[in-house]
């Protein structure tokens, strides 16, 4: 599946918090900082832009899928 090109930062944060166990730690300017303790500590910086650039989104998806030990495709399916 292709990476969505119309996904906003707020939508991405909502999906990561709802489906993948992340929570909002704080916000610094236009970036929302998420963190999780499952399976280990990780912090992510999500730009609160509309839309999030494709390369940035791809990097975030890669980081989450590696940390959670899931396939990239499984993560992309939850973004739709």
Give each language-model segment a name:
Residues 18, 27, 35-36, 64-67, ...:
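Compositionally biased, intrinsically disordered low-complexity segments
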Residues 2, 47, 65:
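Short, flexible active-site loop motifs that bind/organize anionic cofactors or intermediates
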Residues 4, 9, 13, 41, ...:
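Generic N-terminal initiation segments characterized by hydrophobic and/or small/turn-forming residues
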Residues 51-80:
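C-terminal structural segments of small proteins and small subunits
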Residues 1-28:
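N-terminal first-folded block
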Residues 23-59:
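A short, structured beta-strand/loop element
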